[in-house]
Amino acid sequence: MRKPGIVALAASLALLTAPFASAQTSTIATAGYWKAFGGRSNDGTPVCGMSASGKGLFFSIKLFKGDDEMTVQLGSDRWQIKTGAKQKIVMRFDRESPWKATATGFRFSDGDAGLEFSVGVKNLDTFLVEFARSYSLKIEFEGSDVDGWTADLTGTAAVTGAFANCVDKRL
């Protein structure tokens, strides 16, 4: 049985660690491994997001005011990715069709390596509904010797709802 559907904006992932880039955000909901947050980015732009961390891994979804894309960030304290390097990623929510992207390497404020890519507004609702309804997310790194992840999505329906409320109020 699937989790109840979430309309509009919502999402997040699990089993992942790195600090938020912004000291101006606060947690607005927690469920399972997941947290929804809202506030302002380092440059003062309003932002809403969801994240999970643990075992040296990090996953977040962020939507900034004025953007027509949602930002997805992955991180690991074990990665040796160069800033600007490209990495193909395949993500699959349960048995849904895969999401494919080419991510770009960057550094979190603590120095850990990360990968970042965007999901366009035209695909945002589908992405968030799959995220909120699914039980797990499998992430694979094509053409790399980096092991893939399986993220526990327990709690994503609840934090996706909080994320959607944040977007409605702040963005």
What are these regions (language model features)?
Residues 1-9:
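Bacterial N-terminal signal peptides that target proteins for export
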Residues 9-12, 22:
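Hydrophobic alpha-helical targeting segments used for export or membrane insertion
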Residues 24-85:
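An ectodomain-focused feature that recognizes extracytoplasmic/extracellular
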Residues 58-68, 85-91, 120, 125-136:
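Extended Gly/Ser/Thr-rich low-complexity repeat segments
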Residues 72-104:
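Mid-length scaffold segments of soluble, non-membrane domains
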Residues 18-19:
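N-terminal signal peptide c-region/cleavage motif recognized by signal peptidases
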Residues 96-171:
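Internal interaction segment
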